[in-house]
Amino acid sequence: MMRDAEERITRLEETVAHQLKTIEELSDQLAEQWKVVEQTRAKLDRLTERFLSLEEQAQDATPVTRPPHY
């Protein structure tokens, strides 16, 4: 009976160790993904500013008119 309890405790300890390792790996992956999200967000902000600037410049430009023969 005591041997069964020891084996069970050993299995539980192994399971906990495996779960801790998995949690650590997932945490590292999450941190890496968060960096990618932040970089993507910064790039989107820059592209949005650039687009708005170009759109504003296009509104200020003289419109392209068709030649009279069209």
Swiss-Prot record:
Belongs to the SlyX family. HAMAP family: SlyX. This is Protein SlyX homolog. The gene is slyX.
